């Protein structure tokens, strides 16, 4: 079985693009449309990696990182935040919450795969 990745994004088309790239590279991928759904899935299964959007209604990406880190099984799971915002202050908040990486949107599929591979392969 391949490595499992949870993709979290409130925009369906973006979720589908990320999923297509990751599945095309042989990863097992599950989707969540928001932070609440992501937490529910994370409580039932430990993923090898989480890729989450930052700008989501309700639970944003940085808050989701913090909530995932509160689940002991996610202490060492890589979490990458995707965002159109790339400011140093927001990245610092992400790192402080426990984010492993930050990637700008729109993303380059090859760059995404390179980042994903460094954490799960």
Task: Name each region found by the language model.
Residues 16-24:
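Charged docking surfaces used in two-component/phosphorelay signaling
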């Amino acid at each position: 079985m391949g490595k499992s990745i949870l993709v979290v994004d409130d925009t369906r088309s973006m979720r589908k693009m990320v999923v297509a790239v990751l599945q095309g590279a042989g990863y097992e991928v599950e989707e969540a449309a928001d932070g609440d759904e992501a937490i529910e899935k994370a409580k039932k299964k430990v993923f090898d990696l989480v890729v989450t959007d930052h700008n989501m209604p309700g639970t944003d990406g940085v808050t989701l990182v913090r909530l995932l880190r509160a689940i002991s099984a996610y202490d060492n799971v890589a979490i990458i935040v995707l965002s159109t915002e790339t400011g140093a202050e927001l990245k610092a908040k992400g790192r402080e919450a426990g984010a492993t990486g930050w990637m700008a949107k729109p993303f380059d599929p090859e760059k995404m795969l390179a980042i994903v591979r460094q954490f799960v392969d």
